[in-house]
Design a protein with these regions (language model features):
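NTP-binding/hydrolysis catalytic cores, primarily Walker-type P-loop NTPases
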Residues: 15-18, 128-133, 141, 245-261
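Phosphate-binding/switch loop-helix module in NTP-utilizing enzymes
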Residues: 103-184
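Phosphate-binding/switch region of NTP-binding enzymes
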Residues: 188-189, 193-252, 260-261
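A short acidic, often aromatic-flanked loop/helix-cap motif at beta-alpha or helix-coil junctions
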Residues: 92-94, 100-108, 223, 261
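Walker A/P-loop NTP-binding active-site region of P-loop NTPases
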Residues: 24-102
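A generic structural signal for well-ordered alpha-helical segments
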Residues: 56, 79, 183, 207-208
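Loop/turn-to-beta-strand initiation segments
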Residues: 62, 93-94, 151-155, 185-193
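N-terminal pre-Walker A segment at the start of P-loop NTPase domains
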Residues: 2-19
Length: 261
């Protein structure tokens, strides 16, 4: 099981809202952590990120959701299936979609020509809680996430695999080092899904080394259930923890029991 280092009072933890998970993590994820989520299937791990982000936003954390291969309306529709409506949260600036998808698609439609800008999509194309940005993903991340982080903010990078297939691993590593430093200083969280089948072992090992928390999702293809393996966690003495979960009409449900492996 996971044991905290030092007294509980000295370790600030952020509860995910997933009861069985928070219990096994000693009260939640340590604040100031970059969380790498490794899976061979996209659906469950993205659902996990959306569910925790919505729960944290409902508790007062500001969410910056960086989406690369889906536009914000697509993500909203996914979340609406589970009654996670971000409309009011976006209007209140508690939830912001950073849209790196739409500008790239628009550039492709235009043959890659023309200067992209914040307003290229025209009036009314963006809701108050989403920003459509230029095609350079690193510029987008630096300008509209790193420079905007406040205390306790939560960032979702959907997904880290999409960054890695568009940029060199060394460049992504540098970016994650900077992002990790900012998150540590502001006691926030970053969730980074990684689709294991898209990368070699060296790349996965490199990103795992940079991450504060590493979780591997093992999903049974024939059933909507699986196991989470926690291999690494900062500010905790961690023996790899195996936690069963299932996917229900309420999202990802962690079992109230787990076992040490």
């Amino acid at each position: 099981m996971i044991r905290n280092i030092g007294s509980q009072d000295r370790i600030r933890r952020i509860r995910t809202g997933m009861g069985g998970l928070d219990e096994k993590l000693g009260g939640g994820i340590p604040a100031g952590s970059t969380v790498l989520l490794i899976s061979n299937q996209e659906g469950p791990v993205r659902l996990f990120c959306q569910q925790i982000a919505y729960s944290l936003c409902s508790e007062g954390h500001r969410i910056l959701y960086f989406t690369i291969v889906r536009n914000p309306p697509y993500i909203r529709e996914e979340m609406a299936v589970y009654d996670w409506d971000t409309t009011e949260l976006e209007q209140g600036r508690q939830w912001t979609f950073i849209d790196a998808y739409s500008p790239r698609v628009q550039a492709l439609l235009q043959g890659g020509q023309g200067q992209q800008s914040m307003g290229f999509m025209g009036p009314g194309a963006m809701t108050p809680g989403s920003r459509a940005l230029g095609s350079d993903l690193f510029v987008t991340l630096r300008r509209d996430i790193l420079s905007q982080l406040n205390e306790g903010d939560v960032v979702v990078i959907d997904s880290l695999s999409d960054l890695l297939v568009n940029h060199e691993t060394a460049s992504v590593r540098e970016l994650l080092e900077i992002l990790g430093g900012q998150i540590h200083a502001r006691n926030g969280l970053v969730f980074m899904p990684l689709l294991s089948d898209m990368h070699d072992q060296r790349t996965t090992a490199t990103i795992s080394h940079l991450s504060d928390v590493v979780v591997e999702f093992e999903v049974e293809s024939e059933h909507l259930e699986g196991r989470m393996r926690f291999w690494k966690m900062r500010r905790a003495i961690l023996r790899p923890l195996l936690l069963p979960f299932s996917i229900t009409d309420r999202g990802v449900m962690a079992e109230t029991f787990g076992r040490v492996i």
